[in-house]
Amino acid sequence: MLDPNLLDILVCPVSKAPLIYDEKTAELKCKASGLAYPVRDGIPVMLEEQARAMSDEEALSL
């Protein structure tokens, strides 16, 4: 689980848009950039090179 206060202040480093936490995949997802950032051991890895590109369908479903 990610601290809700932390989630309130984190934004996508690429688009500066808000992030949505997906508990199933342990990722922070950004609809605007289409990137999903991993959360490892409760720590968000907010590096573009570590992000996974989501499919258009996945990004639109957010």
Curated annotation (Swiss-Prot):
Domain of life: Bacteria
Cystines in this chain: none
InterPro entries, A to Z: Trm112-like (IPR005651)
One Pfam family from the record: Trm112p
One GO cellular component term noted in the UniProt record for this chain: cytosol
Family as reported in the entry's similarity comment: Belongs to the UPF0434 family.
Name of the featured protein: UPF0434 protein ABO_2103
Organism: Alcanivorax borkumensis (strain ATCC 700651 / DSM 11573 / NCIMB 13689 / SK2)
